Amino acid sequence: MATEIITEKKEIVARTRSSGITFNPPVTHDMVRSLFDPTIKKSFLECCITLTILANFVLCYYLINWFGLSQAKLIFLIQYVYWRLAYNLGIGIILHYQSHYESLTKYANQNKLFKKESAKTNWIASFFQFEIKSKMPNDYNLHSYPDELNCWLLFRQFVDLILMQDFTTYIIYVYLSLPTDVSSLINWKSLIGIAMILFNIWVKIDAHRVVKDYAWYWGDFFFLQDAELTFDGVFNISPHPMYSIGYLGYYGLSLICGDYRVLLVSVGGHFLQFLFLKYVESPHIERTYGSDSPSNSTQHQIDDLIAKENYDYSRPLINTGILFENFQFLRFSDYFTVSTILVLFSWFFTSKPSNNFLFVLTLLTKLTTWLLTSWILFQQSNRKWFTRLFLKNGYTQIYSYQQWQFLYNYSLIVTNTLLFLHTLSELYSIQSSDGLNNSHVIFGLLLCAIQIWCNVETRDAISDFGWFYGDFFLTNYITTRKLTSQGIYRYLNNPEAILGVAGIWGSVLMTNFSKTNVTLAVLWTVTNLIFVKLIEEPHVSKVYGNGTRVSGVQQTLLALKPFRWISDLIDDWGNKMMKSLHGFDSDSDSESISSGKKGNLSSLKLSKKSKLKNRVQSDNKLAPNSKFEIEDLEDEIVYLPNSVTISWKLPISMFNEKDWIGLYNVLETGSDRTQTKIPSLGHWSAVDATGYPHDSINTNSITEFKKGSKNVSGRVTFDANLLYFKPGIYEFRYHSKNSHKVLLISSPFQISFPEFDNEAQVDIKNEIMKFLDAISCMKNEKYFANDNKYFTADAFSNYIKDSFGIELSTDYIRRVNGDVEVISRRVHDIKEVLDSLN
């Protein structure tokens, strides 16, 4: 019907479209009551329509007796086609001209068909006035109403004839197509068919309850009522329910018949109805009430903004189910995607793989791609992991999003292609053995069409930004934190989780419930639901808030207690799963960030540190009457590039000029406190310069050496040439002679990079230059590692991560030749991007 309009019980006010004349429309009745309710007044044409309907059954009886069943079916099929074309083409043309030019109204006005004096001179006017008077109550004065209303009342008679004939001839054709053996009708198909028919009846009744006669008979093509478009009842669960789910009865009857010819006729009739909707009704609705197109939605605006701000951005390649959109001739990934499909098809037709092999390949591919994409989105939602990965390697935020678009689209295309090839192989096997069930194949193709339609509607509603989960990657582009309720999302919260697998189950139907296809369909459905519940919904709550969007279908179903109970049960299960997942994720987070932030080491290292501190006294007793202390160490933390000085003292009887002090990571030394079993790797210092005359680096660290009659003492300073540039818990060990025998062990202490909160790029640059200069690793304002072999590119990367909270890969540092200006600018840009994402 033309519009979804609901009015309150107050007096209705209407106005003509062009002249603006206001009036109160009279009470009218629906088609069934007008024709068949004996208590309601009947017009001449209504009596003729009723007799015509009854004549169809008489004609059917004689056709069967005279010409046989097959000829009777053919005649009623021809009749149905005629009346269906009269409906969609005939009424469509009339309404088209009425919508654009008000042709019927102008004709009536020009010929004065409803003027009182015309009835005496014009037999057409006389008949029309007689028809309206015989139809309406006695107090109805047609001359006091505008021509628009009277035209509409006559138009209703024309509609009643066509619609009732269309319905009657179709029902008779279906009846003639039923199997002669009644017992064959007792099966699950009949049960489903009856359920679909009952649902169809409810749709029609509820639709009329909402829209009343005015919209049922396309009243707004003639005049307008002071009422607004509404979405209530059946209009809450489906777009254009009279043309979509309002035809489920067609498919229910086809299912009961089990005749694919009936199904094809039903599909054809339904298809013509959609053409009527597309070319007649929808354009009129848009002109009259405004467009409901989501083209100006936030998601569409974001797509435009991305393209506007990034000159190298182009819309991603998308498979619509049949063709490709946005193919770019200069984008290699597009060629790679299309080539993959061509290779798969070529391999299928040349190698002819077995059904089992295709099943296993499809199953593994679906599982692998689902796990990969789900893991990426989960990590991206919690840590912005995917964006960080590309940012630290020198790429932009938009580039990382483009790579995700390719990865996601490629995984969809490959899995769907493999499923298609597997289904094709199954169909070929069935055709070779038992033969295909044509009805199953057609119903399966219809489900595939529903999935394609769902995908198109989803993309139309949320644009590329929503289709590719842009709110996981580009939250800084979101201007309005509000979920869309346009298009298909008015009716379903997650259409891809329900209708998005319709085609998958269509493959099950086409293959006559093949075990492999059932398994794949279950896999597709379960993975979709898990993804929506555990990844998508938590992220949506995080980005758009906890306010839930209630879809039309959900609103309708939640009014029923059983559905409400099931919904609560699923929500509880999902919340428990999310708590366990986030608990695991938090543990992994604590481990991943324990690499050296100020006071932010892992609990394992801190506990080790406290335990080791408690046994320092017992460690020093390894050498009695000795001293081994770190000087001026605040909070037991050394911030690089500061140096560390340790003072020592030993009895002269225990001293040897070959003694030396090594620096070790506590976690690597093990539990042996008397013998060091790992090498110092150059992080050591002599205590007496005479002991190692040729090791200048390891003797220049000696700042004091005193040798008395009873004791020997000294001070050693570990600077950037000897310290580790790996944050952690460390200790000094004093070794006897040129061995690894331990005489003294210092208190454990922490080596860490400093932390900075600099926002300006120039401040970041100054801090980096100051640090590199202090450790002799800068030349011409570039990182230069030759003067300090311990501060490698990895160490530089860790310094940037720990000091500024930004990750840069060593590959990027090398790629820009360690240029401090470029690196500082990159750090600044990444900080801005990540801050905007938060």
Swiss-Prot record:
The chain crosses the membrane at residues 49-69, 74-94, 158-178, 185-205, 237-257, 262-282, 329-349, 357-377, 404-424, 436-456, 518-538. Residues 70-73, 179-184, 258-261, 350-356, 425-435, 539-838 are cytoplasmic. Residues 1-48, 95-157, 206-236, 283-328, 378-403, 457-517 are lumenal. It is found in: Endoplasmic reticulum membrane. One of its GO terms (molecular function) is phosphatidylethanolamine N-methyltransferase activity. It comes from the Eukaryota. It is a multi-pass membrane protein. The keyword Lipid metabolism applies. Belongs to the class VI-like SAM-binding methyltransferase superfamily. CHO2 family. This is Phosphatidylethanolamine N-methyltransferase 1. It comes from Vanderwaltozyma polyspora (strain ATCC 22028 / DSM 70294 / BCRC 21397 / CBS 2163 / NBRC 10782 / NRRL Y-8283 / UCD 57-17) (Kluyveromyces polysporus).
